[in-house]
Regions:
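Long, contiguous binding/interaction regions
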Residues: 1-69, 75-98
């Protein structure tokens, strides 16, 4: 990853953390939403990122079946835990975080 992209990513997460801290009292319920290509083990990889957290996970395939929407409702202890989770799943090929 080039330096400019790394800087933009870091700035994005800093802004997200500030916004989450402004709008929540911790711990708080947080709804993660992802779109992943419906190939290999993408959905399972997202689900496993939230193992043992008491998450409620809902998946919906697109009309064509090429993509799957994954919604994860889970109690998070603070904004940094949310950001860490986004970073953890960002390595899944083709994932889009909403």
């Amino acid at each position: 990853m080039d330096q400019e992209k790394e800087n933009k990513t870091a700035e994005f997460y800093e802004r997200l953390k500030a916004e989450l801290d402004r709008s929540n009292s911790w711990p708080a319920e947080y709804l993660f939403k992802f779109i992943v290509p419906s190939i290999a083990d993408n959905v399972e990889r997202v689900e496993s990122a939230f193992d043992c957290m008491g998450a409620v996970i809902k998946t919906t395939k697109s009309k064509t079946g090429k993509f799957t929407s994954v919604s994860v409702d889970v109690q998070m202890k603070d904004a940094q835990e949310i950001i860490d989770k986004y970073i953890e799943v960002s390595v899944i090929e083709g994932i889009v975080s909403l």
